[in-house]
Amino acid sequence: MKSIYISIIMKSIYKICIDGELNELKKRRNEIYEIIEDIPNDGDDLREDEDDISFAAAYCKDHDTALEMYKYLYEKCGYPRHCVHYAMVGAAASRNAKLINYIYNDVDEHEKEEFIGDLEDELAMTDHPNPRVFIEYALFELNKV
């Protein structure tokens, strides 16, 4: 019974994230905590990328709002760190260089090479015309600004 309830609130929050409704997301903090409790542990998490609300937050078309929603989920609500991959996939799909840069600068040093490889794969799957140029811009050029 609880999984049906979690599924319903997850779909609702997912839509809020896609639509970029940051203030509405903040009002739903208790429900976010319930979703977090229901997320499988790292290694047991076999969900699809699109099944995570951090994907939806990162996929938001307003890139500045996407960054703020990401920060809210991970820094304020304590969203599980093993779900960062889902956010990276959403950011790659929406071509959000600012969020990709933020995520990259926040991952552990030993995870950066794997992150770049995964990012390149995701960009290729979304038919990005030149993943390498985008990655160089997102990860290195934005740091110079």
Spell out what each predicted region is.
Residues 1-145:
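Ankyrin repeat (ANK) tandem alpha-helical domains that serve as protein-protein interaction scaffolds
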